[in-house]
Amino acid sequence: MSGTSATLADLVRRPSVNPMGRDLSGPEYLEARVTDYLVQRFTAAGIPWARQSVAPGRDNVVARLEATVPDAPVILWDAHQDTVPAEGMTIEPFSPLVRDGRMYGRGACDVKGGMAAMLVAL
């Protein structure tokens, strides 16, 4: 698996379901697992980061790379960590499945795929 695909699989394996007003009755809820993964990746890459507490188990992570070229334009990359609930999925939502060159799993296209691309690009 390539760097981006492996990173995406790592993210899909980390449930981060937004409860959307529902009772927190399962271990798949909230974004803490993805937050911890992002912190680990940024730390390993030597990228400064900060947590922003929103609610218990629902921290944001902000990382910042300084420009290496004077007066370079600012680029902002943004991705949310939460996914919609997994009810109704016909595959195991948190076990990445590659079929016909595509990865399936909760959040693979919204927005963990984009997040994986950003992480690998760093």
Regions found by a protein language model. Give the residues of each.
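Acidic/His- and Gly-rich active-site-bordering loop/insert found
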Residues: 1-108
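Acidic/histidine-rich catalytic neighborhood of metal-dependent amide-processing enzymes
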Residues: 103, 111-122
